[in-house]
Amino acid sequence: MKSLGEFIIEKQAEYPQAKGSLSGILSAVRRAAKIINRDINRAGVVSDLVLGSMGRENVQGETQMKLDVFAHEAMKAAFYSRDDIAGFASEEEEEFTAFDTERGHNAKYIILMDPLDGSSNIDVNVSVGSIFSIYHRVTPIGTPVTLEDFLQPGHKQIAAGYIIYGSSTMLVFTTGNGVNGFTYDPSLGTFLLSHENIKIPKDGAIYSINEGGYLKFPQGIKKYIKYCQEDAPEEHRPYKSRYIGSLVADFHRNMLKGGVYMYPQASNYPNGKLRLSYECNPMAFIAEQAGGVATTGHERILDIQPQALHQRTPFIVGSEHMVNKIKDFIAQYPDN
């Protein structure tokens, strides 16, 4: 079975212009994933150190968990060690970080990341994940990066991926040429290629949404949920409702089995809740590379021009036929 390192070296030939830089960044992600995986696996043993709240909120207004901070620092250290990264932005910090050194000024790439998605699930041993996104900077080489570098539409990503920490730990990523998954073998300390050229089934029978917010959803989403619940055996309905509360875990299951994930706008979240740059863009890039679709319900996610670092958006992603059906319902039942 091919290791992640071997895979990266093999694929490096596809990006001669990168001169190994992209491969090096993915290696940094791999290193950070191992550190985060170790801390998560020890969570129940050293609970006072890694479980629970930091007693403060992050920029999103969410309670910051200890493991959020550990994961953030692990990713930050891994990226700072690279000569080819000019700066990064994290869901956990209000402002982006420019690596204000000569090597940082001369670096070509910037990173956006959600260090630990679903961290509130840690203390009940539910799967969580890390999400990352890589872009070419747009400001001149030799200068510090600016906000402009981080406010790029998702279709300009050159790589994106996630790590899911569950019954096994997997790194799934794309560089714009399909999606591949690597499972961590702790006995070897190595990620091994276990899921090659992943494709999302065109249709599925799983819908994932927090139905506790049903009364606050748009009419089109309400109608689609009822459609999923209808008894129509000839169309393989009712569908299964599966919602973990960790975007990475829900997305990962649906990508492998076929399904759709929804986090629409709601009366209490009129612009949606998920972050465009840290969560939606990387997952949308992965989904499209695997043959899926990602939309707000009205617009392709990867076409949105971000206006702010922590901009939120409605998010619907998954199997092509299911997402298109939701778009039909949204168009048919507009909210006036």
UniProtKB/Swiss-Prot annotation:
Annotated pathway: Carbohydrate biosynthesis; gluconeogenesis
Coiled coil stretches, renumbered: none
Binding site for substrate: 117-120, 210, 243, 273
Binding site for Mg(2+) 2: 114, 117, 279
SUPFAM superfamilies: Carbohydrate phosphatase (SSF56655)
Catalytic activities: beta-D-fructose 1,6-bisphosphate + H2O = beta-D-fructose 6-phosphate + phosphate
GO molecular function annotations of the record: fructose 1,6-bisphosphate 1-phosphatase activity; magnesium ion binding
Subcellular location: Cytoplasm
Pfam families given in the database record: FBPase, FBPase_C
Co-factor requirement: Mg(2+)
Cofactor mode of binding and number, as noted: Binds 2 magnesium ions per subunit.
Keyword annotations from UniProtKB, A to Z: Carbohydrate metabolism, Cytoplasm, Hydrolase, Magnesium, Metal-binding
The protein's Enzyme Commission number: 3.1.3.11
GO cellular component, one term: cytosol
GO biological process, one term: fructose metabolic process
Residues annotated as binding Mg(2+) 1: 91, 114, 116
Entry's family note: Belongs to the FBPase class 1 family.
Classification via PANTHER family: FRUCTOSE-1,6-BISPHOSPHATASE-RELATED (PTHR11556), SEDOHEPTULOSE-1,7-BISPHOSPHATASE, CHLOROPLASTIC (PTHR11556:SF35)
Subunit-level organization: Homotetramer.
Protein name: Fructose-1,6-bisphosphatase class 1
Organism placement in taxonomy: Bacteria, Pseudomonadati, Pseudomonadota, Gammaproteobacteria, Cardiobacteriales
